[in-house]
UniProtKB/Swiss-Prot annotation:
It catalyses: a 1-O-alkyl-2-acetyl-sn-glycero-3-phosphocholine + H2O = a 1-O-alkyl-sn-glycero-3-phosphocholine + acetate + H(+). Belongs to the serine esterase family. The gene is plg7. Transmembrane segments: none annotated. This is Putative phospholipase A2.
Length: 438
């Protein structure tokens, strides 16, 4: 089709031990939680997530082709201008029928009546619920239910809002909003309000998955939309009822770039839960930060993580001097409430009183986009135009990212993670190019 594009691009099969199912869920937000901010172009009306869930490999599973990576019925961003965006549009037209490698089947149930862990993922700027599908789907293939958020704070590349509470109203598109000056005072206000907006979305998504676990439905009173028909989603939600670990202090929060900064914001937040009489940050057991963008962390003076945290840094971001120096300073902050003057360097990485340690790893040859599907799907020529020059094999980068992420969960006692114990994935200089740097 010209320009070196291929219409046969495929996403890799998820490499964990279990097949994976998926659906998109959009839930109306209760009126009292429909927050709005001056810097964000619309009120929070719905919350939209892609849910990845593990399936039982001993039962029949059928491949599906209906969960599309680039749903064209939602459009290509109208805001896109200039050669770089034109190139992306042209390439995207070759992905019209690209489907996620997911299946229809029965939910996996851990042995001994165990419950499935729940993992919430927040995307970065110009991301979406689908852009990190290989990462999120592979995490799910280890027996974890993953909620991939689609944020409506003008940070997603494009998002369509369909409010099922008002079906008579036409859907509308939330466009990506460029930041013209990252260091302006107005940008600090924007970053803060975006993070508050994202936190609200994550709170509502968390309550939604709790409702599924407790009631077998996302909400008993509010309507919702799904990417599958009612017989399909009712079967999925009923199978999840009573089988998810949604207890306070047992959830995992993760994100890429601005999504990783979102995790830091939640960790340091003094916001109460919308639905419970405790602080929202106490919902989480541990965190995984992929290429955290430190500018909003520094601008908003966010404290170090309260939870055991794995950080995976791309080679590109390690060479991003301002960001990496800010990360080093943040992690060894001597004023952190859980650190003492006599601590060793490794102990200064501990951000909880129980001496559970964080890890910071880098994989040689990777770029900022390596946490996403883009290096797999975009030709090298396109990434070169977009200034994404990578040397690492994108499939191998995905494998080591997910192996280390899953092993980190095992080592922090997240129960019922499937697959073999893999301690080498959190050791330095055993896997070529994989190095612990702090």
């Amino acid at each position: 089709m010209g320009l070196g594009f291929s219409s046969k691009k495929q996403l890799p099969a998820y490499c964990g031990p279990l097949p994976v199912g998926s659906l998109v869920l959009e839930l109306s937000v209760p009126e009292e939680f429909r927050c709005e901010y001056k810097t964000i172009e619309h009120k929070l009306r719905t919350v939209k997530v892609r849910i990845f869930y593990p399936l039982d490999p001993t039962k029949d599973v059928e491949p599906r082709t209906d969960e599309l990576w680039l749903p064209f019925h939602e459009g290509i961003p109208e805001v896109a201008k200039g050669f770089r965006w034109w190139l992306l549009r042209a390439f995207a037209s070759g992905l019209t029928n690209l489907a996620l490698p997911v299946y229809k089947g029965e939910l996996f149930h851990p042995p001994n009546n165990g419950k499935l862990p729940v993992f919430i993922f927040s995307h970065g700027l110009v991301g979406s619920r689908n852009v990190y599908s290989s990462l999120c789907g592979t995490i799910a293939s280890y027996g974890i239910v993953v909620l991939a958020m689609e944020h409506r704070d003008n940070s997603a590349i494009i998002s369509t809002v369909r409010d099922p509470l008002h079906p008579e109203e036409p859907p509308y598109v939330v466009q990506y909003r460029e930041i013209s000056d990252f260091y302006a005072d107005a940008t600090v206000v924007l970053q803060n309000e975006r993070l508050l907006f994202r936190q609200q979305e994550i709170q509502i998504a968390l309550q939604m998955i709790r409702n599924i676990n407790d009631l077998g439905t996302p909400d008993e009173n509010l309507p919702f939309l799904c990417s599958v028909d009612s017989s399909f989603y009712n079967s999925v939600f009923q199978s999840m009822k009573g089988n998810l670990n949604t207890a306070q202090g047992e959830l995992i929060v993760a994100g890429h770039s601005f999504g990783a900064a979102t995790c830091a914001f939640i960790s340091g937040s003094s916001t109460k839960s919308l639905y419970n009489d405790y602080m929202f940050h106490t919902e989480f057991k541990c965190s995984i930060l992929y290429d955290i963008w430190m500018l909003p962390v520094r601008q908003l003076h966010l404290s170090t993580m309260r939870y055991p945290t794995l950080m995976i840094i791309s080679y590109e971001f390690r060479r991003f001097v301002d960001n990496f120096q800010a990360l080093e300073s943040w992690l060894v902050n001597k004023d952190s409430e859980n650190q003492n003057a006599g601590e060793s360097a490794d102990e200064k990485m501990s951000v909880v009183p129980l001496k559970k340690y964080s890890h910071v790893f880098v994989y040689d040859g990777t770029v900022h986009a390596n946490q996403s599907d883009l290096p797999i799907l975009l030709p090298r020529m396109v990434l070169r135009v977009l200034k994404g020059k990578f040397e690492a094999d994108p499939y191998e980068a995905l494998r080591i990212n997910t192996r280390s992420s899953v092993q980190f969960l095992r080592e922090n006692h997240v129960e019922n993670v499937q697959g073999d114990n893999d301690p080498s994935s959190l050791q330095t200089n055993i896997i070529p190019g994989w190095e612990r740097i702090m």
